[in-house]
Amino acid sequence: MADQSFRISRETTIAAPVDRVHALLDDFHQWRAWSPWEGLDPALERTYTGPASGVRAVYAWRGNRRAGQGRMEITESEAQHVAVDLLFAAPMKAHNRVDFTLTPVDGGTHVEWSMTGPQNLVMRLMGKVWSMEKLVGPDLEKGLTQLKRTAENA
């Protein structure tokens, strides 16, 4: 059923080659330069395990109420695509998939950032007031703006 899952996405074009953009997505250490959630908790605890980048690279965090707690793992990494398994443990439990699709265009790279996942009953009821689009959409927009700035100034 369509209402039992969600998909949100945002897109932008970045004046940088695909490989430069890919390098910022494929290495969780690089996310500190552009992630829209960076700065929610100045005392955020970060843990990196697995390879430094690419498939099986893992980033886990634990922070204040705003930052929450969770874990991300890169599950696919190809020249024009990076997929991430995203598990939130707090403040709300959720298991989502994040995809970055990179398309070469004249003068740079077109980037689509999407997030998909199931919506439990509570999320569907909350959706009557606050949709995932409204909750997460602005974060994706902010992240793409910061990714663009970071890639273009590298």
Mark where each language-model region is.
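Hydrophobic ligand-binding cavity/cleft-lining segments
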Residues: 1-52
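A generic structural micro-feature
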Residues: 2-4, 51-53, 64-66, 90-94, ...
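Short, surface-exposed coil-to-beta transition loops
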Residues: 7-9, 67-72, 93-98
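Hydrophobic pocket/interface hotspot
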Residues: 20-31, 59, 74, 84, ...
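Short, hydrophobic/aromatic-rich segments at coil-to-beta transitions
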Residues: 52-60, 77-85
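Short hydrophobic interaction/assembly module
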Residues: 57-74
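A residue-level detector for short acidic-glycine micro-motifs
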Residues: 74-76, 104
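Beta-strand/loop substructures that line and gate deep hydrophobic ligand-binding cavities in soluble
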Residues: 81-142, 147-149, 153
